Amino acid sequence: MRVLVVEDEQLLADAVATGLRREAMAVDVVYDGAAALERIGVNDYDVVVLDRDLPLVHGDDVCRKIVELGMPTRVLMLTASGDVSDRVEGLEIGADDYLPKPFAFSELIARVRALGRRTSVPLPPVLERAGIKLDPNRREVFRDGKEVQLAPKEFAVLEVLMRSEGAVVSAEQLLEKAWDENTDPFTNVVRVTVMTLRRKLGEPPVIVTVPGSGYRI
């Protein structure tokens, strides 16, 4: 899942981004509404965590632009006000969900995941292929009935490959979906992660390298 965090309180924005990355999400961060519009114009996001009171361009206008463009991106709006009238106004503007500050991080994670499920093409709750079972909600992976412990990025890469249902996924696509845009496009992090993932999943190998194209399961 790819998420854009838009929050002018930099410490809060960075803390939210760090927490989401620990949940195997690819996260970009900006600190004002103008930068948010720029990112939305060039990148596809599943969810935007959007502070309402932003400098340069107000969060309401960012939300309106997402709706105007007809994007499938879901918006979780944040605000310092918990007034019912503010929540209603935010939802009427086009936000999909609303979370007043201060908030419990566990609730933020749950709401982002719920919005991400609404963005994605409906799939079975548990993904199964080639003897592998992957539960996106419980963050669990099993190979032939035996649980496999994966790091967040390993889980994210495996989930992308499982969701492709046998189609080839390029290294560039994996980099885009499992990492954020600040990752060096010439890095070998995808190859290294796939190698580690293969080792953890055991024999016989289930991740196939398609020379010049990418990987598939």
From Swiss-Prot:
Electron transport in keyword set: no
Q: Which residues carry this modification: 4-aspartylphosphate?
A: D51
What are its GO cellular component terms? cytosol; protein-DNA complex
Q: Identify the Gene3D superfamilies for this entry.
A: 3.40.50.2300, 6.10.250.690, Winged helix-like DNA-binding domain superfamily/Winged helix DNA-binding domain
Feature: DNA-binding region: 124-217
Q: Which UniProt keywords apply?
A: DNA-binding, Phosphoprotein, Transcription, Transcription regulation, Two-component regulatory system
Q: Which GO terms describe its molecular function?
A: phosphorelay response regulator activity; transcription cis-regulatory region binding
Q: Which GO terms describe its biological process?
A: regulation of DNA-templated transcription
Among CDD domains, the record links this protein to:
REC_OmpR_CusR-like, trans_reg_C
Q: Which InterPro entries match?
A: CheY-like_superfamily, OmpR/PhoB-type_DNA-bd, Sig_transdc_resp-reg_receiver, WalR-like, WH-like_DNA-bd_sf
Residues annotated as domain Response regulatory:
2-116
Question: Per its UniProt entry, which superkingdom is the organism in?
Answer: Bacteria
Q: Which Pfam families match?
A: Response_reg (PF00072), Trans_reg_C (PF00486)
Function noted in UniProt: Member of the two-component regulatory system CutS/CutR, involved in the regulation of copper metabolism. CutR suppresses a defective melC1 gene, encoding a putative copper-transfer gene, probably by altering copper metabolism.
- Know the name of this protein? Transcriptional regulatory protein CutR
| Annotated organism of origin | Streptomyces coelicolor (strain ATCC BAA-471 / A3(2) / M145)
